């Protein structure tokens, strides 16, 4: 099914060499809905003072909502700084990969929750999407859905955008999880 060129969808850029700030500035200036959140990290230099540094949560990925034509134009505008993900969620390998609204919403709940112990993965790993699916019903991750996986002897919630990336959480009490039938 071919989508009309003027219909807005979610897309993703892979960002090269930490060039996210000018791209985020472009999105803000042009009022383009996007997800490229930062967190504050504290650096202790010589144990004298603390330096606060803003670090992107997902340094090599920015999600944005626009039309297919605008997404391709932005890729040309930021040549050698970004790459538009293509063919991950569609049959045509040259077509930009559209991301469902639901996947973006669930991924954003986890990515921007501010909880400790989040690990981000630049690649989607289908081996972690086997088994039972769960929904978080309490706590700061309420509303997130994913698979409970075992990584380095710990059980974590694996939330992904199919074909693009994933995030795992730290420990979530079983009482906060509801199995999705």
List PLM regions with ranges.
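Acidic-enriched and Gly/Ser
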Residues: 1-133, 158, 163-178
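Structural motif
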Residues: 58, 151-153
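Residue-level signal for beta-strand positions within conserved beta-sheet cores that form or flank
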Residues: 144, 155, 168
């Amino acid at each position: 099914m071919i989508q009309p060129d003027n219909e807005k969808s979610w897309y993703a850029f892979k960002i090269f060499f930490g060039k996210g700030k000018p791209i985020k500035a472009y999105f803000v200036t042009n009022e383009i809905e996007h997800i490229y959140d930062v967190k504050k990290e504290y650096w202790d230099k010589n144990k004298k003072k603390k330096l606060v540094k803003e670090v992107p949560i997902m340094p090599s990925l920015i999600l944005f909502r626009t039309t297919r034509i605008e997404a391709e134009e932005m890729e040309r505008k930021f040549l050698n700084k970004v790459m538009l993900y293509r063919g991950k969620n569609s049959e045509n390998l040259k077509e930009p990969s559209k991301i469902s609204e639901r996947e973006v919403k669930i991924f954003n709940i986890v990515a921007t929750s501010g909880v400790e112990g989040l690990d981000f993965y630049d690649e989607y790993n289908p081996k972690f999407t086997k088994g039972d699916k769960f929904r978080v019903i309490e706590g700061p991750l309420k509303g997130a859905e994913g698979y409970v996986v075992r990584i380095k002897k710990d059980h974590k919630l694996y939330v992904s955008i199919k074909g693009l990336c994933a995030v795992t959480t730290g420990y979530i009490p079983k009482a906060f999880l509801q199995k999705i039938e």
